[in-house]
Amino acid sequence: MKLHELRAAEGANKASKRVGRGTGSGLGKTSGKGQNGQNSRSGGGVRPGFEGGQMPLYRRLPKRGFKNIFAKEYAAINLDRLNCFEDGTVVTPELLVEKRVVKKVKDGVKILGNGNIEKKLTVKAAKFSKSAIEKIEAAGGKVEVI
């Protein structure tokens, strides 16, 4: 095979539908749009969710809940993610972002107790779960709420 013999795979290039080019083409006259009506017109059709005048599903279902604009959103990290740090490191939210353990700090960092920690670390964060505090202190580390 040579470079000039390269060809697209069978069915990879599909010809566009040429509509409205005579009845013999099979797509003449109404161009596959059926008879008259809203859908046959240029720009015609109904909006998404419209059910022909019947009360639409999104209005038949009850409203539920709300978004509390004052809620604090914490970046959650499990203990096993902190094993990437050396012994004696002071782990701060800035260091976590720098080491790509967390993408964004948001309103602070919350340390959760899933997994085990083998290193002796000083961890500074906005919140800690009870199990996280126990495990960090059992490993000989310190917990500081900032």
UniProtKB/Swiss-Prot annotation:
Keyword Manganese among UniProt keywords: no
Region spans: Disordered: 1-56
Gene Ontology, cellular component aspect: cytosolic large ribosomal subunit
Pfam families assigned to the protein according to its UniProt record, in alphabetical order: Ribosomal_L27A (PF00828)
Any Gene Ontology biological process: translation
Biased composition (Gly residues): 21-35, 42-52
GO MF terms, alphabetically ordered: rRNA binding; structural constituent of ribosome
Keyword flag Ribosomal protein: yes
Keywords assigned: Ribonucleoprotein, Ribosomal protein, RNA-binding, rRNA-binding
Entry-linked InterPro entries: Ribosomal_uL15, Ribosomal_uL15/eL18, Ribosomal_uL15/eL18_sf, Ribosomal_uL15_bac-type, Ribosomal_uL15_CS
NCBIfam families associated with the record: rplO_bact (TIGR01071)
Stated role: Binds to the 23S rRNA.
Family note: Belongs to the universal ribosomal protein uL15 family.
PANTHER family from the UniProt entry: 50S RIBOSOMAL PROTEIN L15 (PTHR12934), LARGE RIBOSOMAL SUBUNIT PROTEIN UL15M (PTHR12934:SF11)
Subunit structure: Part of the 50S ribosomal subunit.
UniProt protein name: Large ribosomal subunit protein uL15
Source organism per UniProt: Clostridium botulinum (strain Loch Maree / Type A3)
Organism phylogeny: Bacteria, Bacillati, Bacillota, Clostridia, Eubacteriales
Gene: rplO
